[in-house]
Amino acid sequence: MDEGIPHLQERQLLEHRDFIGLDYSSLYMCKPKRSLKRDDTKDTYKLPHRLIEKKRRDRINECIAQLKDLLPEHLKLTTLGHLEKAVVLELTLKHLKALTALTEQQHQKIIALQNGERSLKSPVQADLDAFHSGFQTCAKEVLQYLARFESWTPREPRCAQLVSHLHAVATQLLTPQVTPGRGPGRAPCSAGAAAASGSERVARCVPVIQRTQPGTEPEHDTDTDSGYGGEAEQGRAAVKQEPPGDPSAAPKRLKLEARGALLGPEPALLGSLVALGGGAPFAQPAAAPFCLPFYLLSPSAAAYVQPWLDKSGLDKYLYPAAAAPFPLLYPGIPAAAAAAAAAAFPCLSSVLSPPPEKAGSAAGAPFLAHEVAPPGSLRPQHAHSRTHLPHAVNPESSQEDATQPAKDAP
């Protein structure tokens, strides 16, 4: 059997020494991965990274351009000049928030209607919202018509003015109307202040002056230091009413002056005002009521209120007639009011009744106190003495008073 098969040539075994000095470069078809990364990584990686970044920036710019086209025109006109990418994103966020809020309101309405509940808003508010929605639709249609047929562009000043005017009108329609005569928070503030100081007034002051006079306009009192004048008493007008009692037991605080020469008027005493002309028979539609503090009257004129005052401190606040006479005359008082006041206060009849030769000019122009005051009359020389006295001095009446023996100056 071995004879039929030709003998194969015996394979010659090559030893290691036979391969020394031979070049086998053709046998290696590729390089290992490590050597590939070391050599070609820098050049092959830069190109894909640049392409990826460019594609990413292009996508961002394309999306921002689409958002800019989808924005409403009134949002675009809020900023002048070129719309930057950040501005476009901010306007888009603002618009999305508004749409989200509107969607939430509509969703709540739908749920309320499904549950059979009444509308969340009043019919007036619902009609106002519907009108505002229609107003916005009409404004948008006007802008589209001007841009299409009149060739108006959003960058033109007249277009911007038109849009601003329409939005201003829409804002006025949404805001509630406020009465121009009185602010919304004025009455609650005055009521709160009166309620807060009510207990303090009861503790150390005379009864509050209540005024109920519907025919006259509310005006400020001439003496605002009494605590009853000012804006808190604007809506009320009436004659002082003091209930029977003995409020003299209430504690009174005396304010000492810095110099110590003269005690200042107490707030409780300043609050006690003689209201002449507040009600009938002194009520006049044209003449405003006037008030006179006690310390401007002689003790005899204020005798009817002495039971309510502290006898010990009365001489400190009321000027004696012999020391400093105060001729009183109000030019705005009518003849009937002056006669009634003279009958009520006999000691003032000489100064309230006009002289017979000048009866026709009793309500003449007022005179300033510093122009017609007699040189012999004495005034309180104190740093905190009043300079805004609510009366004027008549020279004739002052001369008549000077002749009386009870009122001679020392």
From Swiss-Prot:
Main location: nucleus
This protein's record includes keyword Cell membrane: no
Function: Transcriptional repressor involved in the regulation of the circadian rhythm by negatively regulating the activity of the clock genes and clock-controlled genes. Acts as the negative limb of a novel autoregulatory feedback loop (DEC loop) which differs from the one formed by the PER and CRY transcriptional repressors (PER/CRY loop). Both these loops are interlocked as it represses the expression of PER1 and in turn is repressed by PER1/2 and CRY1/2.
This protein's UniProt keywords: Biological rhythms, DNA-binding, Isopeptide bond, Nucleus, Repressor, Transcription, Transcription regulation, Ubl conjugation
Start and end residues of each Orange domain: 131-166
Region of interest: Disordered: 209-251, 371-410
Tissue: Highly expressed in the caudate putamen, pineal gland, granular cell layer of the cerebellum, olfactory bulb, piriform cortex, hippocampus and hypothalamic nuclei. Moderately expressed in skeletal muscle, heart. Weakly expressed in lung.
Annotated PANTHER family: BASIC HELIX-LOOP-HELIX TRANSCRIPTION FACTOR, HES-RELATED (PTHR10985)
Gene3D superfamilies found in the cross-reference section: 6.10.250.980, Helix-loop-helix DNA-binding domain
Protein name: Class E basic helix-loop-helix protein 41
Keyword Repressor annotated: yes
Gene: Bhlhb3
Any one GO molecular-function label of the UniProt entry: MRF binding
Disulfide bridge map: none
Cellular component GO terms, alphabetical: nucleus
Record's subunit section: Homodimer. Heterodimer with BHLHE40/DEC1. Interacts with CIART. Interacts with BMAL1 and RXRA. Interacts with NR0B2 and HNF1A.
Pfam families recorded: Hairy_orange, HLH
PROSITE patterns in alphabetical order: BHLH, ORANGE
Domain bHLH: 44-99
Organism: Rattus norvegicus
Cross-link (Glycyl lysine isopeptide (Lys-Gly) (interchain with G-Cter in SUMO2)): 31, 121, 240
GO biological process, one term: regulation of neurogenesis
Swiss-Prot/TrEMBL induction comment: Expressed in a circadian manner in the suprachiasmatic nucleus (SCN) of the brain.
Localization: Nucleus
